[in-house]
Amino acid sequence: PWDHIVRVDGRRVPVRLFAPRTNSRDSILLFFHGGGWVTGNIDSYDRVCANLSNITGRMVVSVDYRLAPEHRFPAAPEDCYAVARDIFTDLSLFMMTPRQITLIGDSAGANLAAAVSLMARDRGEFLPESQILIYPATAADHGPNSPFPSVHENGEGYLLTAKHIEEY
């Protein structure tokens, strides 16, 4: 892997690039890590991104977005959007077309992938054609009155409980 800095409006957004062992560079997975918007970084997801690159044969660009509570909303989605905009608007950097770039994330990162897609649509600067949302955080109702049966059936007895999700 190699590290790079995306500079946006006076701030620096670190990214880490992973190339597959096959040396194929015909597409990119733009990865946003999970962690409830408060934990995780490109170091903690290093192995995940390296494996993702090798298994899929794609380049992976992992974004080290700013975390809460030190950085209030919308810091994280703005960082992710800035990196995506850089990649989509300077396609010569990777010699790609928009079709070859997929936004991907897990949990809070999946939420960010969806948010970046919506921001791109609304701002009209670029438009991602594909996203992969791995167990996305898309609803905020995980309390006792949650309408989701899975919260009641699986909200206890696991590492990430319904109560912990509410705390995020």
Outline where the language-model segments fall.
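Alpha/beta-hydrolase superfamily serine-hydrolase fold, recognizing
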Residues: 2-168
